[in-house]
């Protein structure tokens, strides 16, 4: 028998249920993220000032140069062409985990940047490379140093010299008139297995893209590579037999026919 008490209970239940449903918010609708194309600039930016450093500046955390030009003019760290120089002749020395960004490195310097451990280099430009633009000395097999954006001009030999272990990542980078964009050391006092990842770079007027030592177990992975024909699509990756200190490594050959060169020559574009 349906009583007034039952009717009241049903009414109260429906009222509470309706309130609970009304309290549930409508699902939020978010827009899909906008895909931003990564920039690759081929022009040396204008400097916002100039500083000549008497000695190498050591960076322990992060340093934003705000597009000021730095070099070692008038000091022992000034360019000595292809004379072998060292860390003391660098403009900047990055401690393990340090980062540097928005800097122009002028022509009056011998070594550019030395990374004692894993480092991050963002939007750094070399006006005129002397010996090497950047030297990587990390020692851990899992260490990674990343170079993003920026570019280098007039490197008679190497832009990135990888003397230590681990991996180097180079992306969104411009290189003009150079010997090699990257070289895994083929005759350092201590040999390591190394790898390099190169993505979205423009190579303009160079001899080789990357040079690796296959007998040390090195590998190179290259994507979105563009050149002006120099280096050729074959020479964007070259293999060597590394040796001990005091000897010279021997070149094996270049191109995607070598399994350590992980790229497709026919996919190399133009810039």
Q: Which role does the model predict for each range below?
A:
Residues 32-55, 62, 67-84, 114-271:
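Extracellular beta-rich repeat passengers
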């Amino acid at each position: 028998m349906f009583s007034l008490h039952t009717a009241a209970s049903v009414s109260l239940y429906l009222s509470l249920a309706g309130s609970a449903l009304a309290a549930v918010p409508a699902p939020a609708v978010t827009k899909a993220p906008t895909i931003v194309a990564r920039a690759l600039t081929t022009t040396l930016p204008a400097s916002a000032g100039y500083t000549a450093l008497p000695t190498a500046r050591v960076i322990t955390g992060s340093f934003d140069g705000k597009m000021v030009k730095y070099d070692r003019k008038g000091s022992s760290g000034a360019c000595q062409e292809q004379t072998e120089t060292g860390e003391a002749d660098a403009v900047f020395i990055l401690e393990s985990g340090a980062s540097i960004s928005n800097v122009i490195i002028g022509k009056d310097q011998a070594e550019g940047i030395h990374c004692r451990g894993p480092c991050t280099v963002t939007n750094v430009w070399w006006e005129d490379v002397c010996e090497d633009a950047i030297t990587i000395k990390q020692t851990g097999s899992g260490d990674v140093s990343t170079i993003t954006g920026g570019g280098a001009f007039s490197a008679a030999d190497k832009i990135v010299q990888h003397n230590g272990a681990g991996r180097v990542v180079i992306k969104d980078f411009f290189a003009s008139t150079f010997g090699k964009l990257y070289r895994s050391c083929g005759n350092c006092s201590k040999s390591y297995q190394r790898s390099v990842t190169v993505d979205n770079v423009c190579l303009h007027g160079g001899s080789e893209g990357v040079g690796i030592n296959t007998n040390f177990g090195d590998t190179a992975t290259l994507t979105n590579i563009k050149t002006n024909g120099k280096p050729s699509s074959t020479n964007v990756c070259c293999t060597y037999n590394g040796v001990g200190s005091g000897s010279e490594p021997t070149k094996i050959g270049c191109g995607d026919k070598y399994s350590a060169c992980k790229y497709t020559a026919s996919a190399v574009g133009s810039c």
